[in-house]
Design a protein with these regions (language model features):
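Short, conserved SAM-binding/catalytic segment
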Residues: 1-10
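Conserved SAM-binding strand-loop segment of SAM-dependent methyltransferases
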Residues: 10-20
Length: 278
């Protein structure tokens, strides 16, 4: 349905309902145990985030995963989906996958896979998106752009998390937001508070942690406070409060009641207010 909504003719579709990670259709090993993967010029994926999967040790023999030395955790299949798509990417192709930010910095096995991807020079860019873009989740997500045949070992970081239009139920990337991401990706240059081209050595110094704030500084300094102006405003506010209290006392003194208890209460309020005014 998603393909049809984006004007892909059904004659150009090949659909299969199966467990992607369990059955690498239409591929598989031949009678000699050799795998013949079907490769694509482009791979685009938005898999279920942090899904569970069967990461038994036999998966380490799977050609999709074995070159990375570790398997994605049982309760977080994010890197399993990533490696599946990357395996089917042509040598000169480009892959883009949407995942939660956790894949950028989580440790243990995921850190091992992330390090291997960087050492193999397969991560091309990391693009942080705004929160609440998708119907299924409100969490902020990230686009990882991957290639198998990069010319340089740097990685472009883009923080596009603040560039969006707030809708009634979800946020929307405007045309200018998308154009800015694309132009920045093509230019591969630093943009103040938006993008940074990090060298492999810089990433290595950060222990292969790809958390975007480590590379793109979006900090906005607080404006300087004019203490004299603040003091004057505070004095003016206090003066206004005193005027209002005096006006209230005058109004209360005009009140009368045959009920002695009510009048006693009013007089107590007047006494307290006059004490504060002094």
């Amino acid at each position: 349905m998603n393909l049809m909504m984006h004007d892909v003719r059904y004659q150009n579709m090949t659909l299969k309902n199966a467990d992607t990670l369990e059955m690498d259709w239409p591929d598989g090993v031949d009678e000699h145990g050799v795998d013949h993967p079907h490769s694509f010029d482009m791979v685009v994926a938005n898999p279920p985030y942090s899904a569970r999967w069967d990461n038994n040790d036999n998966k380490l023999k799977d050609p999709r995963f074995k070159e990375y030395g570790a398997l994605a955790p049982k309760t977080k299949a994010d890197y399993a989906f990533l490696l599946h798509g990357l395996y089917h990417l042509k040598q000169d192709g480009t892959m883009a996958i949407v995942l939660p930010h956790g894949v950028l910095f989580r440790g243990a096995k995921e850190a091992q896979i992330r390090k291997a991807l960087l050492e193999k020079n397969q991560i091309d860019a990391i693009i942080g998106l705004p929160a609440n873009l998708f119907y299924s989740t409100g969490i902020p997500t990230v686009v990882l752009v991957l290639k198998k045949n990069k010319e340089s070992k740097d990685v472009l970081f883009i923080d596009a998390s603040k560039n969006f239009e707030k809708g009634k139920n979800q946020n929307v990337l405007r045309k200018e937001d998308i154009d800015k991401i694309i132009d920045t990706y093509k230019e591969r240059k630093d943009v103040d508070k938006y993008a940074h081209l990090a060298s492999f050595d810089e990433i290595k110094e950060n222990d292969f942690n790809l958390n975007i704030p480590r590379y793109v500084d979006t900090f906005e300094p607080e404006p300087e406070v004019d203490l004299r102006q603040v003091s004057k405003e505070l004095h003016d506010v206090n003066a206004q409060i005193r005027d209002n209290e005096q006006e209230l006392v005058g109004m209360l003194k005009q009140l009368t009641s045959k009920d002695d208890e009510v009048m006693e209460g009013i007089n107590d309020i007047i006494k307290n207010l006059e004490g504060e005014i002094k």
